[in-house]
């Protein structure tokens, strides 16, 4: 018996280059002499990807196995590191019966003394898993120590199992001898396929749930060691591209369900493949992909506007379209005296007032550029006091709005304090720094060995200026340099800090001009944005696949956010797609900006104070604004097409259901983000006829109740599911 661990992409390559080998493989699988382990189209870095990408990779992979081999793998496995607590529910939804809870690459994952476990995922679903780390089938040492290993397994394991792994054609001759011995009798055991092991051996019966911090990927260290280009910013680009692609798909689906005309998925699928492939390549210029993606998203927005009855280029207003399932507030500039229009970018004059437009989730809002007519005020008595004017939002080294106040250090340019008006004490401080180590300039210690010391650079401000004092937003820009402990310049920096009126989100734009490059060890030498807080007992949480999970490790991974929770106060760092963060002690966190091989020099971060729904805010930080200029007013100035009444549920991956060339319904993915069970209502602009939760088989699908224009959907904690609704 042979167990073949290979991805669908590898199988496609074999079918193209070695068709005879694949034909023999298919015959062996059909005859039961071989079993295939796999599942994905290709081995992507799963812990950093959104659930939609992982589910799509599994779906495409299963289709490839079925097409080439005539069967699909029942057990999921991969060589490269990629274990994450989200996998059990996604694998069960795709019809997998078991998985390998180990990888043959670098990285860290939890192990135990049992070869068979019931792996429990984020949502509580369980999947049978094989957790025994394989031994090297090509090494003679494995067989010299075989009696000892067999004794340990028989002593501790509920179902005694040993796993041998080797590259094709590289097995030890002793491994072949062991197979011959086993063919005469089961004295030393019986060789079985992975599928047979799951069928014949019993489970331990107890579900095992591992924390997210027990898994640590080797992606950053591997990327720097392989001299890959942009090991950090490629994830930022992916986050923005994926958010734009989701907006494009949502707009097209909304337009389709309104007009009844389907749209072709070929160009969207091509863009999706390019976005995912860009994670693995070192292309110097990806502007063509960004241009194609942005043009397609704008075209989809115009199609939706036309479906809503708003003709573009025929009116004087603007139509704001929201692809997210939550409402969004945007700052849109009114027409100035010179007739200029547009969303302010920081260069607008203080007198160019803006309007805050509230756009419903999965809806639209039309905005007139003309300021509202002045209302006649009440006659003021001679003894009444004149209204005290509000202080400017930015003055000197202070930036403020209704909720909090930011104070800059005039000497260093760092943010000295972020003070919440509703509480007491400093919530957060921030600075830019280079972290590195040196040993050649330091004296020897007492035993004669050279001393290595890790140090952080020091900020020195050269200019601190108020760019915009208000009244709609304030902006302060700091220019300066970073110096080593001896005063030598190592980099230049520009940080622009922006705060809008009525917002709980602080926007940081950072530009770096490094003169000293980081060392090859990326987790120990880097340029970073460093944050500090005063509560040593504060709990850290990080975004993982769109949900918040506790974070206690030193090295953290999150492309969405890191939350600092102290009592009832929540301070969140929105990472804008930057994935790697290092905790220093109990009160400091470094968000990595530049490591060796990184070419990006401009970065954006956000700091949110008591944001009500953090996963949605993090996704909103990545999603672009869609405002169509010159749009005529639709029949209704504002409205929505779909509405979710549960704020802890995020809808994504909208697709139309097409039959006989007509749109007869839609599909959507739902993710519960806060660990709370709920029965939510999905309201539709048109009365639905039938709806159900999708599953791996038709028998496992669940019919959903419908009440007028509402589809009632029960959803569990951290559950990711897909529903289908037909008119």
Regions found by a protein language model. Give the residues of each.
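N-terminal catalytic cores of secreted or lumenal carbohydrate-active enzymes
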Residues: 1-49, 53-56, 64-65, 96, ...
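Catalytic grooves of carbohydrate-active enzymes
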Residues: 124-312, 323, 484-485, 568-633, ...
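CE4/NodB-like, metal-dependent polysaccharide N-deacetylase domain
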Residues: 52-93, 145-163
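Catalytic domains of cell-wall/extracellular-matrix polysaccharide-remodeling enzymes
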Residues: 67-113, 173-177, 508
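Loop/turn elements at helix/coil->beta-strand transitions in domains of secreted/extracellular proteins
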Residues: 2, 31-35, 69-73, 94-98, ...
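The substrate-binding groove and active-site-proximal loops of carbohydrate-active enzymes
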Residues: 5-15, 39-55, 70-81, 102-105, ...
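C-terminal (or distal) subdomains of carbohydrate-active enzymes
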Residues: 87-93, 106, 115-116, 174, ...
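Acidic, His- and aromatic-enriched active-site or binding-groove loops in soluble protein domains
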Residues: 20-39, 88, 92-110, 118-125
């Amino acid at each position: 018996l042979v167990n073949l661990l290979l991805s669908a992409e590898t199988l496609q390559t074999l079918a193209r280059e070695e068709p005879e080998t694949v034909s023999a493989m298919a015959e062996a699988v059909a005859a039961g002499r071989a079993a295939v382990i796999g599942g994905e189209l290709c081995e992507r870095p799963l812990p950093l990807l959104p659930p939609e990408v992982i589910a799509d990779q599994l779906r495409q992979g299963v289709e490839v196995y079925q097409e080439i081999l005539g069967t699909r793998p029942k057990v999921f496995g991969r060589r490269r590191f990629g274990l994450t607590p989200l996998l059990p529910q996604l694998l069960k939804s795709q019809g997998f019966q078991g998985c390998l809870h180990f990888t043959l690459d670098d990285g860290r994952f939890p192990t135990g003394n049992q070869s068979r476990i019931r792996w429990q995922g984020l949502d509580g679903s369980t999947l049978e898993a094989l957790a025994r780390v394989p031994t090297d089938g090509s090494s003679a040492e494995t067989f010299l120590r075989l009696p000892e290993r067999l004794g340990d397994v028989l002593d501790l394991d509920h179902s005694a199992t040993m796993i041998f792994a080797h590259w094709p054609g590289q097995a030890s001759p002793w491994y072949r001898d062991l197979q011959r011995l086993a063919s005469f009798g089961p004295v030393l055991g019986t060789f079985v396929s992975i599928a047979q092991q799951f069928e014949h051996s019993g489970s331990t019966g107890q579900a095992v749930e591992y924390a997210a911090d027990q898994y640590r990927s080797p992606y950053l260290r591997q990327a720097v060691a392989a001299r890959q280009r942009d090991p950090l910013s490629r994830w930022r680009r992916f986050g923005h591209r994926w958010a734009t692609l989701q907006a494009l798909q949502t707009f097209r689906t909304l337009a389709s369900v309104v007009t009844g005309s389907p749209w072709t998925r070929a160009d969207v699928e091509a863009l999706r493949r390019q976005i995912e492939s860009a994670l693995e390549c070192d292309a110097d210029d990806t502007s063509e992909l960004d241009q194609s993606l942005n043009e397609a998203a704008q075209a989809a927005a115009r199609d939706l506007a036309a479906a809503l009855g708003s003709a573009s280029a025929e009116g004087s207003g603007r139509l704001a379209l929201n692809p997210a399932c939550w409402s969004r507030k945007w700052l849109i500039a009114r027409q100035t005296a010179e007739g200029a229009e547009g969303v302010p970018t920081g260069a607008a004059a203080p007198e160019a007032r803006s309007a805050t437009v509230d756009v419903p989730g999965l809806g639209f809002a039309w905005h007139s550029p003309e300021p509202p007519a002045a209302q006649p005020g009440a006659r003021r008595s001679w003894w009444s006091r004149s209204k005290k004017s509000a202080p400017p939002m930015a003055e000197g080294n202070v930036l403020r709005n209704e909720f909090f106040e930011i104070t800059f250090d005039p000497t260093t340019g760092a943010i000295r304090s972020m003070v919440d008006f509703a509480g007491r004490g400093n919530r957060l401080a921030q600075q830019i720094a280079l972290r590195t180590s040196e040993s050649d300039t330091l004296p020897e210690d007492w035993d004669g060995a050279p001393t290595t010391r890790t140090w952080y650079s020091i900020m020195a401000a050269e200019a601190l200026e108020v760019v915009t004092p208000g009244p709609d937003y304030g902006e302060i820009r700091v220019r300066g340099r970073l110096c080593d402990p001896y005063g030598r310049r190592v980099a230049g920096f520009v940080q622009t800090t922006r705060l809008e009126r009525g917002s709980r989100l602080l926007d940081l734009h950072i530009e770096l001009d490094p003169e000293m490059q980081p060392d090859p060890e990326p987790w120990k030498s880097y340029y970073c944005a460093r944050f500090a807080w005063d509560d040593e007992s504060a709990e850290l949480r990080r975004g993982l696949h769109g949900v918040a999970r506790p974070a206690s490790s030193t090295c953290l991974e999150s492309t969405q956010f890191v939350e600092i929770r102290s009592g009832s106060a929540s301070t969140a760092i929105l990472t804008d797609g930057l994935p790697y963060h290092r905790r220093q002690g109990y009160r400091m966190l470094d968000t990595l900006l530049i490591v060796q091989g990184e070419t990006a020099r401009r970065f954006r971060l956000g700091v949110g104070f008591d944001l009500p729904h953090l996963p949605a805010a993090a996704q909103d930080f990545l999603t672009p604004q869609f405002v169509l200029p010159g749009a005529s007013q639709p029949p209704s100035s504002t409205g929505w097409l779909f509405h979710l009444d549960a704020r802890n549920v995020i809808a994504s991956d909208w697709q139309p259901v097409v039959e006989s060339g007509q749109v007869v319904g839609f599909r959507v993915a739902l993710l519960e983000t806060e660990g709370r069970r709920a029965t939510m209502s999905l309201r539709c602009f048109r009365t639905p006829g039938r709806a159900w939760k999708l599953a791996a088989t038709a028998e496992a699908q669940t019919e959903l109740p419908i009440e007028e224009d509402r589809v009632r959907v029960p959803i569990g904690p951290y559950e990711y599911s897909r529903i289908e609704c037909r008119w």
